[in-house]
Amino acid sequence: MQQPISIQQPVVNNINNSPNNQANINNNTTNNTNNNNNNNNTTNNIANNNNSNNINNNNEINNSNINNNINNGINNDIDRGGEKKANKLIAKTTKKFNKDMTAYTSGKFFELWRNQVVRDKILGYVRIHNLHYDKRVFKCIDLNNCIDNGADLQQQHNCHRVHNHYHQDLGHNYFGKVSRGIVSLSDYKYYGYLRSVHLIGYEQHEEELIKTIKSLPVGVSTLELSGHLNKIIFKEGSLPTSITNLTISSPTKLGYKSIPSHLKTLKLNSTFNDPLLVQGRLEGQLGIVPLLPIDGAITSLDTGGKFNQPFEAGLLPSSLTELAFGNEYFRPIEVGSLPSGIKSLKLGQRFCLPIPIGSLPIGLTELQLGGTQQNPILTIGCLPPTLTKLTLDNHFNQPLVIGVIPSSLKTMIFGPRYNQPLPPSVFPDSLTHLEFHQNSSYIFPLKLGYNIPSNVSTLLLSFRSQERNVTLGTNSNIKKLRCGGDYLPSLSSDDSTIGAILNSFSSSSSRETFPRSVESLHLNIVNVLDKEINIPSNVTKLIITGNNLQHDGPDVFMVGKKGSKITHLKLRGYEKPICQEMFKNLVNLKSIQFIGAYNHQLGPNCFPPQSITNLEFDCLPSVIPIGSLPSTLKSLRVKSFCTPFLKNSLPSSLLILECAFVRSFIDSYEIVDEIFVEQQAQYAQQQLLQNEQALQAQKQLEIQQQVAQQRLQQLKQQKQQQQQQQDNEQQLDHSIENNDGSIQDDHEHELEEEQENEEEEEDTNNHQHPFLQEAINHNQQLQQKQQEKYLYSSNNSNNYNYNNNSNNNNNNNSNEEDDEEEDLIQPIISKEWLPPSIHTLIIRGEPTIQLPLPESLTNIHIESKNQSILHNIPLMEKISKLVRVFDYESDTNSIFKKSLAICNNINQNQNQNNNNYNNNNNNNNNNNNNKKKNVKK
């Protein structure tokens, strides 16, 4: 096999040739000058011209050789195939560029990058192997024991790491399939984009783990260690200098100078309880030294849940700005023990000791206390005057006295167990955010201007008790209000300051007190809806939640009144079928979201026809009929969908589609609905009937074909008999007339007869009987109709069909029946059922993909665990430019919002282009008119 062309050799030789050529030219120049003194000026000019021409020619040759060698090496190796060779070649070229950057000019990179073939190959392999991830997870395994501590390796090859950590994050004790792309962490050695690594190790792989940590790529700045590392001791130099964020999630031992001074963030495991003083060397002598680097760069430290060791002044780094103690910490805080630069401090649930005055840093801005009911821990003057946020979390239930809260406080948050009366003026006037836990048991009176400052703009209340007494005046500054249960504070309907009620009420009497200025309204309604809800006219966002939400009577539940400004509607637990009359008053409605399983068939024209652009379903078990979605829809999101799309069921205006293709409805939600079961049964019966009809039609067609073939054979036999009689008569006449004929003439006559027979057979094959041709056409029409009606059928052989289950060959009848049932709920992504204008497709699950796809499609977002697409090399080579991979841990809502933003930008750009086009036309018309006027003048 031909070896790849080296890059360095021609570079060195060509670069070294240029000075030699220049030296030779200079020598020739001096010789000519000494020999021809009379023609000194002329000779120098000629030599200089030759010198410059030779140097330029050599440089051009060198540049072309370098580029040709690079491109030929990459193209030849990629064309020969082999993922591993391509990765090595890319890594090699990257290393050469980094090492010999001084020898290259700034234009060499662009000369390589402008090679479209090379660039497309590089980007294709990057997407195929998911090399563009910011974070990777690797697990040490034993190749001799492919099953180690529950690590189920379904594909055994030379892979040393498992980076599919989906099950591990869910608390499972097994792992998924090993990826075929990256074989070890060493493959990332020359890649600078890898920033975060999660290593899962075991005690028996201590040496390998330490070696792996030391050989991490240069760009890695975040490292997380987990697994069984009880006996592993980290010593000086164990961590590379590039690590700035370290998380140790497993029990480990930290030795002298094991924490590097360049570390910025350190999070220890939940079982860490070692002293902060260790045995080490100080000024060349053995002694007790601090574990953490005092003069280091650590800014954030989390000691873990079990830490309960004393510390003195100087043991914590002076650079700390964030410090968090776990729930087991209950040591006293001495004055001066905490660094003065700390801005955020967290104390756990067991901390119940008094806080001495001056013990907290003078610059502290955020404080979180767990506390118990034993001893008072807050006294007057213990909190610094710079505090802006105070959280009394979980078990804290100590009374607050006047003067404890500093005058700088802006945010106050109470936990679920706080139930102490708040005296008047306990909070300063600077307070703007007051929040009680959603399950708070606070039962004492609250009054604006008494124990609630008048400057509060956000008030979040939630009560479990029935005794409530909250008074809010008409001149309040509250812009956001949340209440729980069936309770509404005393408000005036003319209050124009409240901008949002986040959680509200079920009784109709309390709805009369909604302020007119409310723009966002969240109704928490118990089971039954009234026929109409009195919603303020300025509300633009409406959320209605409840369990088994229904309405009384056969009348349609009306949302809002005429002239309503609602643009976004969210329904949770709505159990009635929706219809267009339900949204009759919502002329400005643009977005509808159904939370929970919607177990009804979507009817035709059930949504407003000219306003809806965004539609979301948590679960949609039924088939989407043709014409049920609004014609103006631009984005559709279905979190769980298990039935195939029908052709033309998606509107042509759709730009963004997000669908989570699940194998069954029960996989996503642990409920079985009778309506859904009936719909699935009806759907299966319809499919069986259609299959039976297709079989009957095929049998009839076969019978018709047999009859037609028999008729053709009869006609052919008759024609042959007639032809044979004519031949016999001709032979008889010929024998009488030519008795002296030769054998050669007879042989030629036989050859002519054979040719005539062959021509007759071809004529009969080309000109079939009309009845047979009609039967064949009828069969083709039946097959075409069946393919158009149900796109999940696998009879279409014209398209490329990439199915992850295509390799499973089952010989048993039971397995074939199971495969047929799986095909019923296996959707297909193809050009036939996607709208022609779609540009973004978000796939969750593993559907079947048929090529070609719509030409307007520019982005395909898939999950990192999608095996059917990422590991299908022929498919990825064709759609690699469209694929964008997102991790399962990421928030899909953010991806959906980004896609919506792209959609809006496209619309804005189109409008802007149209406006620019119109403006240009107007300018051209004006210019033409001016020219005509000038000509007339």
UniProtKB/Swiss-Prot annotation:
Keywords: Coiled coil, Repeat. It comes from the Eukaryota. Disulfide bonds: none annotated. Residues 1-12 have a biased composition (Polar residues). Residues 1-60, 719-767, 794-823, 910-937 are annotated as: Disordered. Residues 13-60, 719-729, 794-814, 910-929 have a biased composition (Low complexity). InterPro entries: FNIP, STK_FNIP-Repeat. It holds the Pfam family FNIP. FNIP repeats lie at residues 307-350, 354-394, 396-439, 598-640. Residues 677-769, 902-937 form a coiled coil. Residues 751-763 have a biased composition (Acidic residues). This is FNIP repeat-containing protein DDB_G0271996. It comes from Dictyostelium discoideum (Social amoeba).
